[in-house]
Structures are given as C-alpha cells and as structure tokens.
C-alpha cells in the first residue's frame, strides 16, 4: 500500500527501473476470493488484544507522518503525546500489506486497522462473521488523497470507454474503490470490465516473489492490459511525463493519464478503525488517541498554511517545519534530504482531514462523500461485484470533533478555484482538458421559476458529482428543441421567405426568420436554462445543506448554451423526442494542469 509520491527522486527511480527493467519477467496476478470473507486471512485464530505495548499499524502515506511525529518516532514511547493519549506505549509499525494487518487484528496483536474506507468495507463482512467482537469501528479520518493516486489507460478518452477493457489494480488496496467509483460514474459495473489483481501498489523490491507484482509493471509487460490504477509517479513514467507514452523509457505506447485524485479529490479517504471489543472496553482511550492525532494535524496544518504564504511566509517557522520533516522524509522517502518532496506530498497530494473534516465526514449525513454515503455506495457495489455476499456496514465511533465541543466553530470561507467565468472556460477548453463523464437530465418547459425542490433527485446527483470531483471543471450544458430550426432550414433551402400560420381561423403569412436567427435564439434559450440550473443548485446548497454564500464555491461551474448543435435526435418525430432534445447535461472535465496549487517547490527553498 506504499503510496509515496512527488519525489524529485522520480527520475532516479525511473532510471533504476529502466536498468533493472521488467522486460521478459512474468506478471504475478493474484486472485481475490469472492466473496472476500472466504479469504484464508479470515481463518486466523481469534485472540484477545494483548496487554502492554499497543501495536498500531501505519502505511506509507504522508498523513501517517503526523502519527509518527505525535509518537516521537516509531518505537514505543510512553511519554509521547500518542503514548499518553493511549495510556500505554505505542509501537508504530509500517504494514503496507492489508492481509498482514487483518491477521494481526484478528489474532489480537493489534486492535487497529489502518486503511481506506473502501478497504475497511471490504473486510467488514469477513471480520464480523468471525465474531461481532471484531466488527470494525471507524474512529478517525486521517486524510483525503488529492493527487497521489490515479488511473492511466490507452485507447480510453472518456470513462465510458473502459467498457470491455482489461484493467489492473492492487488487490485489497486503496485503488479498488477508486476503480469502482470511476466505473459507477461511467454507468458501468465490474461485469463490464476484466479486472486483474496484483499484490503491490508500486514496484516493491522487498516482495519475495520474483517477477512483476505491481500495476505499472503489469501494464508495461502485459499487452492485454488497457489500463491501471497507480500512484502518480508511476503514471508519469507510464505516460512519458504526463503526456502520451511512446513505448520508450518505461512508458507504454499510447498510454495517457485519465485522471488523478487531484480531480477526484473526495474518493479515497484514509481512516483508522478499531476492534469493537477493544473499543467497548476503552472508549476514552480511543477518543483520546483520535483527539491527539487531530491536534497534531492542526499543528502540521499551521505549518502548511505558513508555506502557502509563499514570499510572506515566516522563514523561522519554515525552517522549523523542514527540520521536523527531515526524519519523516527518511522514513517515507528513504532520504532525509527529500524534505521538500515530503512536504509537497503532505500538503498538495493529500489533504489532512483535521477536526472539521472529521465532523463533516462522520457527522453530516447529508454529505454525498461522507461516512454514511460512502459505506452505502461501496457496499452496494461490492455486493453487485460479488466481493461481499451481503451488506455489512462498518460502524463509526461518532465522536464530536468541534475543537470546543460546547461551542461550534464557525465555518471557514471557501477560496474560489477560478477568478472569473473566462478563467474557468479557458480551463475547460485548454488542450489538456479531458471530458470524463456526463450526467443528463430533463428540462421543464419553463425555466424561469426552476426550483430544486421540484427535482430533488437531479440536484442530489449533481451535488454528489460536484463534491466527489472537487478538482474538476463542472460544465452545465443546455440543449434546445431543434424542430423549428430544422423547419426553417428546410424552408430556406427551398427558397421560401415566408411561412403561413393559422391565426383566428385564417391563414396569414409571416416573414420566415433566417436560420442564424433561430440558432442564436436557441443558443440564448439553452444558456438561460443551464444558468437556471446553476442558480437552483446554489439555492439547493443554501436550503438543503445550510451553506452560506461564503461556504460555496461555484467558480468551477462553466455554463454553456449548446442550442441545437448537439441534438439527441437530429430529426425528432414525436413530442417525446423533442422533449429528450430539450435537456441539460452536467459534464465533469479534468483540468489538472489548470488548477492553481497552494504552493510549489520554490516556496520551500
């Protein structure tokens, strides 16, 4: 589950891979038990949690550096912040293999699981089947992935092009849920693709099994593979630096980045879970652990905010941050000199959840990407794909995470991503922009008084997509009925300049408008309809979600009137077909190179 990112070490790693190469090596595909509860890992003998030193897993992920800092390192330290919170010395152990974590969890070596919300959902059925004591309780969100993970493919432009393709993903890893989300939003199921699994998330020299065990290596070596879920450095290598792979220097010919979690920024949620029996016996200790880690996140967030001030940053504080990050760079990037890379990973490619994020994730049942919604979505998809036999929802600890539980913290104002309508349109039409998927909905006959309450399902779906793809441009397209345009074009092609219409029982002649006039009118009408949807969405956020204007960012919306340029039916022959032409579309457009970053490498030097 190693998701190390952003190193300027990337070119060194690429060199090592090209020298050591995967040419001619066998790809070791892994099977995944269906349902997963039949996996041999669930045959592990159940044991009580061992007393004394508390074993706590971490994974190769920047946010876990905060956990290590709170413990004063990986070794047991009763006097550390984390040790005091846990009421016992805590030994932090890197366990990137989820199966290994599950064995320790079941046997009682550790009461904790460290994974993503998708991974916890995958294991919940098997753990609960052993004993209700093992049912996982998710008690903390650490972070969101906001650039570290993604998907790469050849022969794919939109996500719907994945139908019939073969893709490779790490078995039981964080990318399984990313693949599920991409398929769902493309209107596909697991049955529409062939999924192959490998043991590692990236090349792992410590894997004792010779051959290729990672998605990038499989994509490179197996010509039947069309795409892979991978970490960002691997995506860059596979696509010749984020463009299109040529087949040289470990790239795959024709491969290009489809998206990363910079676009799909609310998909991969990293969490901690605890055994039900241990939580029942130690609720205050679990809450104290979570609170201490979130307080440590607040400390790190303060340092990241200082970096984001760029030239105005407090230089003494910047030096302090780099100094405390040195050992973390050594642990996660195997080089203490790679401090800037670690900070970029922590502050750009991931997003610390903080107290406010945990309150939102666990406490807001209306959130389309929160704990309740994520569990429901993941479980439904896993059941449909045969990965679980019945829905077994993980529970949440449901702590209150206001920093002062008696006084709610006022919501912070949201910083707009784009400065103007012109800027978001330029991003949507840039050469690097890519349409990922669309959602089509019908327009009512009159848009002047469009109210979201009349179309709650439409606006709930819009909100889900807008929130999940927090780094994308959201284009609202309006389409008009083309019947009158077709009629005028036909009449004009025959040389007509007038049209007869029945008025008051008698036919009268009227001047026939120019085709361009009809097209322009349709463009204006369709734009006004699309804009009415944006206006109604803002109303939905205010009234259904209780957001103020300062808490909304509508700058990512690009409103576009398509007029009659893209009809669903070019020659509508029924009222139903005319209605289907008069539609709205929500288009999610990836524009990763156009999204401004909070800071860059130059701000750390």
Task: Tell where the protein language model's regions lie, with residue ranges.
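Sec-exported extracytoplasmic/periplasmic mature domains
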Residues: 69-72, 76, 106-110, 125, ...
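Periplasmic OmpA/Pal-like peptidoglycan-binding modules at the C-termini of bacterial envelope proteins
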Residues: 409-431, 487-489, 501-523, 528-605
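Periplasmic peptidoglycan-binding/anchoring modules of Gram-negative envelope and division proteins
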Residues: 443-505, 534-542, 586, 594, ...
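Pocket-lining segment of extracytoplasmic ligand-binding domains
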Residues: 117-119, 128, 196-328
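Bacterial N-terminal signal peptides
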Residues: 8-18
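Secondary-structure end/capping motifs
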Residues: 280-389
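N-terminal hydrophobic or amphipathic helices and topogenic motifs
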Residues: 20-106, 343-429
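Short, glycine-/small- and polar/acidic-enriched structural segments
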Residues: 25-210, 215, 219-232, 258-260
């Amino acid at each position: 589950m190693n998701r190390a990112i952003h190193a300027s070490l990337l070119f060194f790693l690429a060199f090592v891979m090209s020298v050591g190469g995967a040419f001619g090596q066998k790809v070791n595909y892994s099977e995944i038990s269906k349902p997963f509860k039949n996996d041999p890992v669930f045959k592990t003998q159940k044991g009580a949690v061992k007393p004394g030193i508390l074993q706590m897993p971490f994974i190769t992920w920047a946010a876990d550096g905060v956990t290590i800092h709170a413990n004063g390192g990986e070794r047991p330290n009763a006097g550390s912040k984390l040790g005091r919170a846990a009421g016992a010395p805590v030994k932090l152990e890197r366990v990137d293999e989820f199966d290994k974590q599950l064995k320790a969890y079941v046997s009682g070596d550790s009461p904790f699981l460290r994974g993503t919300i998708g991974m916890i959902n995958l294991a919940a059925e098997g753990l609960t089947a052993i004993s209700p004591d093992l049912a996982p309780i998710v008690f903390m969100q650490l972070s969101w992935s906001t650039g570290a993970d993604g998907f790469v493919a050849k022969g794919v432009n939109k996500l719907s092009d994945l139908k019939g393709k073969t893709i490779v993903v790490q078995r039981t890893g964080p990318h399984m849920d990313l693949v599920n989300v991409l398929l769902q939003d493309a209107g596909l199921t697991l049955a529409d693709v062939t999924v192959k699994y490998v043991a590692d998330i990236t090349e792992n020299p410590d894997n004792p099994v010779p051959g290729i065990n990672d998605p990038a290596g499989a994509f490179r070596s197996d010509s039947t593979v069309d795409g892979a879920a991978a970490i960002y450095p691997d995506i860059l290598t596979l696509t010749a630096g984020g463009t299109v792979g040529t087949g040289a220097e470990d790239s795959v010919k024709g491969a290009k980045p489809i998206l990363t979690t910079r676009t799909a920024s609310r998909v991969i949620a990293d969490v901690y879970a605890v055994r039900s029996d241990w939580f029942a016996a130690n609720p205050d200790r679990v809450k104290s652990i979570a609170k201490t880690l979130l307080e440590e996140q607040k400390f790190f967030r303060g340092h990241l905010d200082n970096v984001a001030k760029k030239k105005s940053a407090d230089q003494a504080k910047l030096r302090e941050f780099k100094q405390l990050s040195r050992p973390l760079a050594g642990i996660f990037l195997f080089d203490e000199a790679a401090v800037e890379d670690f900070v970029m990973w922590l502050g750009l490619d991931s997003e610390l959840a903080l107290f406010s994020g945990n309150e939102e994730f666990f406490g807001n049942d209306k959130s389309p990407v929160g704990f309740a919604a994520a569990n429901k979505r993941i479980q439904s998809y896993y059941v449909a794909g045969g990965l679980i036999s019945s829905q077994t929802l993980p529970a949440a600890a449901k702590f209150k995470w206001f920093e002062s539980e008696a006084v709610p913290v006022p919501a912070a104002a949201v910083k707009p991503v784009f400065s103007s309508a012109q800027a978001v349109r330029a991003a949507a039409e840039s050469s690097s922009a890519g349409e990922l998927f669309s959602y089509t909905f019908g327009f009512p006959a009159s848009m002047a008084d469009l109210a979201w309450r009349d179309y709650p399902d439409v606006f709930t779906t819009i909100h889900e997509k807008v929130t999940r793809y927090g780094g994308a441009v959201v284009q609202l397209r309006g389409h008009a009925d083309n019947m009158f345009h077709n009629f005028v074009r036909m009449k004009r092609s025959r040389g007509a300049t007038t049209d007869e219409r029945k008025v008051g029982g008698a036919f009268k002649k009227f001047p026939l408008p120019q085709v361009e006039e009809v097209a322009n009118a349709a463009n204006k009408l369709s734009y006004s309809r699309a804009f009415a949807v944006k206006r109604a969405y803002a109303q939905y956020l205010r009234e259904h979600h209780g957001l103020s204007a300062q808490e909304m960012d509508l700058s990512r919306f690009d409103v576009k009137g398509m007029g009659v340029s893209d009809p669903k039916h070019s020659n509508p022959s029924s009222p139903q077909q005319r209605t289907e032409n008069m539609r709205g579309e929500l288009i999610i457009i990836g524009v990763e190179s156009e999204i401004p970053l909070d800071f860059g490498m130059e701000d750390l030097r």
